[in-house]
Design a protein with these regions (language model features):
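Second-shell loop/turn segments in exported
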Residues: 13, 17, 24-29, 38, ...
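Extracellular/periplasmic catalytic domains that process cell-envelope and extracellular macromolecules
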Residues: 18-22, 40-44, 83-85, 113-114, ...
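Structural recognition of the beta-strand scaffold that forms the well-ordered cores
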Residues: 26-28, 47-51, 88-93, 119-122, ...
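Long, well-ordered, tryptophan-enriched scaffold segments
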Residues: 84, 88, 108-157
Length: 172
């Protein structure tokens, strides 16, 4: 088979994969309805890719925030929902409208009593490629993720007010 590198980044709060990584077949779904329709028999032991496309028409109509909200639900709740059906990891198509090979990440959630599985954001371009390949044949991926949560520490924000020479009384 062909080997293709995929651009992804761990979701905020994700657990790591085992040190040696994990390999699994990818199941591509658009939304929670498609995931649940596959049930445990279609999901158990697999890596789920939520390939929900950002709604550009909604964004162009002035509802970009709502379009983003529809996309990020899979980032936040995807791992816990897929884990309930036995998934071993979850990938989420980048939530924004950018069409590039940069993975857009954010926070994910876990639920009490549900097995924690690794979660990562995958770039728009790679999500499209995986979905296209999965229509023709099984796609397997090896994930090696090393995120960690460190103890809280005190931190600071630096804020400065610099007076300009042309309009010193205005804030830019």
């Amino acid at each position: 088979g062909t080997v293709q590198k995929v651009v992804l980044t761990a979701l905020g709060g994700s657990i790591a994969t085992p040190a040696e990584g994990m390999t699994g077949e990818i199941v591509v779904v658009k939304d929670f309805d498609e995931l649940n329709a596959l049930g445990r028999n279609g999901i158990e032991g697999k890596i789920v890719l939520f390939n929900h496309r950002f709604d550009r028409e909604m964004q162009a109509s002035g509802f970009g925030g709502a379009a983003y909200g529809l996309a990020v639900q899979y980032r936040f709740a995807g791992a816990m929902t897929a884990a309930r059906l036995g998934a071993i990891a979850v990938l989420v198509r980048s939530a924004g409208g950018s069409q590039n090979r940069l993975a857009h990440t954010g926070v994910m959630g876990y639920a009490d009593g549900v097995t924690k599985i690794p979660g990562a954001a995958v770039s728009y371009e790679d999500a499209e490629t995986i979905a296209w390949l999965a229509k023709a044949d099984k796609v397997r991926i090896k994930l090696t993720m090393t995120p960690q949560t460190l103890p809280d520490v005190e931190s600071y924000n630096v804020i400065a007010d610099l007076k300009g020479s042309d309009k010193p009384d205005e804030i830019v």
